[in-house]
Regions:
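Phosphate/nucleotide-binding beta-alpha loop and adjacent structural elements of enzyme active sites
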Residues: 1-216
Length: 216
């Protein structure tokens, strides 16, 4: 609702952490968007995402959607990915299985064995900056990042192409389940240094996670 009050259309939207297309559906229904580049690191989640392509077209046939089974990060490298049975929690970050949040979450989701919560495999990671250069993008009207504790790394991987971003939306987890090597202050300082200002903040239901919107 906040975005709809202030924006009607976006030419280029980049969706990092597509999962199974929740952001694509939400934005296609509520905004005119010329093109969406949607990234999902997990090959398992990506297969589910691909199956919804026809549905996306029905929602808004005027929006071109590019789906990429690609992991993004701060460097071009290979990293271990944790594919959760509850797929929206999949992440590159280490997990504290002894944390209260982990135990509470998987008890509610009927995961009786902590060891079965996720399995691991390696994924190739590249910087978003490289993709932007490859596609010759000259503007990014809206960048959404939801990567379960890996948001800061995505931002660092933009390099100087962060100057192309007009509006940024991301989630930040304050719970102790995801072991991060940064704090919200690190992200906030980084964005301020790149001429962004926070314009919106909202707590997500039933969890210690906030959604933020910044604009330059």
């Amino acid at each position: 609702n906040f975005l709809k009050k202030n924006n009607k259309s976006f030419e280029i939207l980049i969706d990092v952490g597509a999962h199974i297309g929740e952001t694509i559906e939400l934005f296609s229904k509520n905004f005119f968007i010329k093109k969406i580049y949607s990234f999902e690191a997990s090959p398992i989640n990506y297969e589910l995402l691909k199956k919804k392509e026809k549905k996306f077209i029905k929602i808004n046939k005027y929006t071109e959607i590019v789906l990429e089974n690609m992991a993004l990060g701060a460097n071009n490298t290979t990293k271990t990915f944790k594919q959760f049975n509850e797929s929206s929690s999949s992440t590159f970050k280490k997990i504290d299985k002894n944390s209260k949040y982990f135990k509470k979450k998987y008890k509610l989701l009927n995961y009786f064995s902590k060891e079965d919560a996720y399995y691991e495999f390696d994924i190739r990671v590249q910087k978003l900056e490289n993709y932007i250069v490859h596609k010759n993008l000259t503007r990014i009207d809206f960048l959404k990042i939801d990567t379960e504790g890996y948001e800061y790394e995505i931002l660092l991987g933009l390099g100087n192409k962060i100057s192309l971003v007009k509006i940024l939306m991301f989630e930040h987890h304050y719970d102790n389940m995801i072991i991060k090597n940064y704090t919200f202050t690190d992200i906030n300082n980084f964005l301020k240094m790149n001429n962004f200002n926070q314009i919106y903040k909202s707590k997500m239901p039933f969890r210690k996670t906030f959604e933020y919107i910044y604009k330059r």
